[in-house]
């Protein structure tokens, strides 16, 4: 298949990279054969208050689960992101911020960021926040979001960031689960030219009678929009900062002390509070950021993720700032007010490294490459992809149109639960194949198993598991350790089950085939939905596709495809048949979609993730009880899809 084409590491990149192929092999081998020795050395990349002597105490036995790293050391995450850079790099720019409107821009040095974080840490203390308390952060993409996170870390409070697109109900469920005393928010946020009513959403969330722990709501004045005010509870950010001291001694925290909670959707629909601790997470976030992106001092690094997702935590805040990087933060969306915005920002800020998501790349593809006619892009050196498997066609478009065919692409696979990147190319070490996450990072031991838990060797396909721990791994589900054990360690004994399927090719490269629940069983044969979607999107008239299974009288499951066509393309029965034949040719007769529904839009969260549970229910004609659609960017998409569904029984 065309997706097997190999993009070789250029000699120039290999010669100047942190790691070439030989060094990768040596380091990886050491990390697996002697993990204690490997991490003993690489744990020193961050600053410790009390140096560790004990490295690793881990077991994936579901009756005796243990995940501990650097566990007799102490440190502070905020000090690692700020204080340790001040002696030599106080004047280096830490954050470049560009607002939704490009006319709004700020630059904040490490010295200034340190002062802001210390002041806000003292402000939090003045509002009763103490070590171990959980603080909910519901903020727009502004520097103050990072300030709030780092201030919590500085005083030993645990932050729980909630994505700014979530509904009041979603906020309430997270506040209730975490028993937050303090919420940090903003009057409004700006996104795509629209004001987002953040404070109003918090007010509505706090009307829930089960929210009983919140004492204070700290409000940043972002737009000056009108907000309701509750005297005694609500307090302005700027008022607190006016009187706060610029000195705040960082708390000495155990390596295994909680750093943050981040809620992710669970299969039951109840959010899971993923808990990450301090020492191992900081080592892993900073190391993966440096090695995966081949980061060099002074470069401008842009991660387009929202701070409300794990990518924003690990690769916009903690990893880059621990490494003394200059981070670009953008308040809006990179295709507003036009698809040219992404390229304009890369050129304007001389971005060296871009880390973005396939959903944005596909959206830009659909608009057409003419929007990049004026794009220079000469500053770009490395490009990354995150969030879902990137289909080969989008990979190539990204490589050609954004990367001008000279930037290596690191297609990274990881999860909220893993804390950092697990499977990825390294720019100077790994020949890449469009659509493949390639090889494991240091210390990561992936394996494929069948449904009975038997390890599959060589070229194969199965359930993706991890055989041993790594420092960035989550430690528990907050308040529900049993759920943690059940979700990740019961399915395959002695292994961490990722929930993803994957195949390993003849070169040992890993290809993520999608969530195991996104596998369709057609006449007894397993088909990854990502594979069928990739085939559809490789057709020049298809902008985006989502594929699910639906009940089929003969085959058990049939293949139902939702297809968004490129702008201006006519939806015809002839094209529908052409696409069916196209997939048949690309993958085989087994993968031919039974039903193709035209879709002007797909149900996505505001981070761009397609909510397939809605698509599965619509395809199965189960349209009366779809569940909560409040997290969708555009809930109206659901009604449109229901009205034009193809599998009606009435």
Swiss-Prot record:
TM annotation in the entry: none
PROSITE patterns in the record: AMP_BINDING
Post-translational changes noted in the entry: Acetylated. Deacetylation by the SIR2-homolog deacetylase activates the enzyme.
Primary enzyme class: ligase
Residue sites binding CoA per the record: 191-194, 311, 335, 523, 584
Modification type N6-acetyllysine: residues: 609
Binding site for ATP: 387-389, 411-416, 500, 515, 526
The protein's name in its UniProt record: Acetyl-coenzyme A synthetase
């Amino acid at each position: 298949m065309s997706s097997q084409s190999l993009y070789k590491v250029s000699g120039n990149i290999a010669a100047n990279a942190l790691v070439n192929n030989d060094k990768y092999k040596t380091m990886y081998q050491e990390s697996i054969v002697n993990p204690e020795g490997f991490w003993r050395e690489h744990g020193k990349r961050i600053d410790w208050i009390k140096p560790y002597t004990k490295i690793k105490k881990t077991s994936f036995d579901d009756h005796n689960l243990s995940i501990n790293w650097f566990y007799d050391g102490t440190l502070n995450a905020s000090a690692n992101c700020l204080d340790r850079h001040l002696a030599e790099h106080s004047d280096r720019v830490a954050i470049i911020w560009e607002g939704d409107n490009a006319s709004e821009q700020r630059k904040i040095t490490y010295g200034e960021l340190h002062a802001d974080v210390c002041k806000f840490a003292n402000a939090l203390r003045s509002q009763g926040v103490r070590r171990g308390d959980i603080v909910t952060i519901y903020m727009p993409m502004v520097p103050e979001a990072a300030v709030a996170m780092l201030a919590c870390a500085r005083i030993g409070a645990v932050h729980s960031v909630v994505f700014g697109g979530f509904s009041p109900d979603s906020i309430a469920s997270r506040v209730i689960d975490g028993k937050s005393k303090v919420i940090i928010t903003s009057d409004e946020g700006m996104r795509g030219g629209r004001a987002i009513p953040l404070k109003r959403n918090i007010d509505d969330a706090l009307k829930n009678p089960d929210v009983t722990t919140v004492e204070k709501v700290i409000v940043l004045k972002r737009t000056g929009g009108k907000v309701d005010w509750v005297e005694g509870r609500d307090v302005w950010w700027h008022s607190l900062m006016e009187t706060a001291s610029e000195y705040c001694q960082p708390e000495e925290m155990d390596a295994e002390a909680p750093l943050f909670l981040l809620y992710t959707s669970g299969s039951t629909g109840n959010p899971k509070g993923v808990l990450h601790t301090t020492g191992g997470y900081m080592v892993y976030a900073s190391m993966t950021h440096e090695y995966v992106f081949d980061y060099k001092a002074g470069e401008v690094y842009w991660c387009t993720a929202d701070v409300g997702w794990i990518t924003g935590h690990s690769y916009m805040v903690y990893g880059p700032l621990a490494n003394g990087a200059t981070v670009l933060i953008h308040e809006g969306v990179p295709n507003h007010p036009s698809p040219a915005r992404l390229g304009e920002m890369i050129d304007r800020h001389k971005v060296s490294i871009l880390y973005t998501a396939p959903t944005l790349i596909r959206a830009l593809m659909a608009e057409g490459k003419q929007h990049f006619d004026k794009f220079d892009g000469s500053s770009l050196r490395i490009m990354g992809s995150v969030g879902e498997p990137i289909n080969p066609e989008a990979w190539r478009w990204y490589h050609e149109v954004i990367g001008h065919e000279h930037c290596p692409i690191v297609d990274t696979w990881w999860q909220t639960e893993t804390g950092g990147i697990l499977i990825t190319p390294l720019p100077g070490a790994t020949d890449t194949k469009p659509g493949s996450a390639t090889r494991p990072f240091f210390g990561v031991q992936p394996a494929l198993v069948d449904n009975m838990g038997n390890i599959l060797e060589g070229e194969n396909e199965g359930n993706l598991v991890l055989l041993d721990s790594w420092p960035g791994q989550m430690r528990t589900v907050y308040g529900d350790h049993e759920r943690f054990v059940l979700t990740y360690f019961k399915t395959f004994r002695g292994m961490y089950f990722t929930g993803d399927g994957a195949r390993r090719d003849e070169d040992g490269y890993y290809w993520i085939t999608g969530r195991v629940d996104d596998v369709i069983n057609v006449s007894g044969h397993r088909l990854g939905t990502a594979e069928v979607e990739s085939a559809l999107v490789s057709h020049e008239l298809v902008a985006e596709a989502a594929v699910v299974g639906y009940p089929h009288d003969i085959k058990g499951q049939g293949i139902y495809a939702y297809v968004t066509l490129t702008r201006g393309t006519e939806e015809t029965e002839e094209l529908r048949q052409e696409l069916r034949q196209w997939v048949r040719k690309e993958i085989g007769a087994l993968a031919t979609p039974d039903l193709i529904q035209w879709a002007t839009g797909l149900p996505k969260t505001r981070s761009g993730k397609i909510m397939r549970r809605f698509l599965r229910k619509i395809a199965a004609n189960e349209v009366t009880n779809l569940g909560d659609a409040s997290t969708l960017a555009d809930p109206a998409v659901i009604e449109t899809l229901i009205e034009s569904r193809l599998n009606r029984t009435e």
